Amino acid sequence: MQGSVTEFLKPRLVDIEQISSTHAKVILEPLERGFGHTLGNALRRILLSSMPGCAVTEVEIDGVLHEYSSKEGVQEDILEVLLNLKGLAVKVQNKDDVILILNKSGIGPVVAADITHDGNVEIVNPDHVICHLTDENASISMRIRVQRGRGYVPASSRTHTQEERPIGRLLVDACYSPVERIAYNVEAARVEQRTDLDKLVIELETNGALEPEEAIRRAATILAEQLDAFVDLRDVRQPEIKEEKPEFDPILLRPVDDLELTVRSANCLKAETIHYIGDLVQRTEVELLKTPNLGKKSLTEIKDVLASRGLSLGMRLENWPPASIAED
């Protein structure tokens, strides 16, 4: 039995044809007969459904209460603007959740390059058109929330946030995967006298946030890790090693005084026993507006200060508070 296993041919990477910076063709051969479809289909499914990335998930546009409306001076209706925002290709370093700011006025197109962001964010397609302003006096301002995720998550699946979602915050279908198109083809291959072998040709296009070769490499790694459990079934009864829970972002452990809010806002938060930034970001706008003496002006100040640090209200923090805070 062992001898038959060693007789399997080991495939090698024949060629990587770089069609463009976002489009490549990878050729792998020789494969035993049938293995071209086995590997090609597995990689294709992972590339389409399981690749991590960043996508727009929520948008707030000044003067817009819901997606079924229009804005004066903007050529597109709000639904079309949201659709255009879905095409935004973003790279985010060191963070899973960021807020981007867009302010534009005057006639002409509004493009991704008009978005304001910090050094942790890179807009891959800066020429991507978001909307068009049709009047010299027209303007548009929006807050764009970008999150890290995997695959495709429709806005309808996030209905659990509806009760906490304030009026004017628009949910967007999130397409996290940087892979735009994937196809594979199996052709005949030959090694010496053997002519019943496979050659696997994978053609892949991404949105630019991830290089095609890196996408295939990650998909292969995911597949290999999932198959590891089958390599040695004798280990199935060994106790699982619990992974250490990731630590919280240090900024969440800092007191709200570090935000340097006005005295009025700071006193209102302390009255509600909001002592740490981690306590604050878990509150929703609706909850804060119920705080005595805290009005919309103070709420706007809090939102802007959090946004400048890549945070927002309504965040969910598992296992909060940490033991170090709970003991205080």
UniProtKB/Swiss-Prot annotation:
Spans annotated as Alpha C-terminal domain (alpha-CTD): 248-328
Keyword terms of this UniProt record: DNA-directed RNA polymerase, Nucleotidyltransferase, Transcription, Transferase
EC number(s) from the headed UniProt entry: 2.7.7.6
Superkingdom classification of source: Bacteria
Residue ranges, annotated region (Alpha N-terminal domain (alpha-NTD)): 1-234
Catalysed reactions, as listed in the record: RNA(n) + a ribonucleoside 5'-triphosphate = RNA(n+1) + diphosphate
InterPro entries in the cross-refs: DNA-dir_RNA_pol_insert (IPR011262), DNA-dir_RNA_pol_RpoA/D/Rpb3 (IPR011263), DNA-dir_RpoA (IPR011773), RBP11-like (IPR036603), RNAP_asu_C (IPR011260), RNApol_insert_sf (IPR036643)
The protein's name: DNA-directed RNA polymerase subunit alpha
Encoding gene per record: rpoA
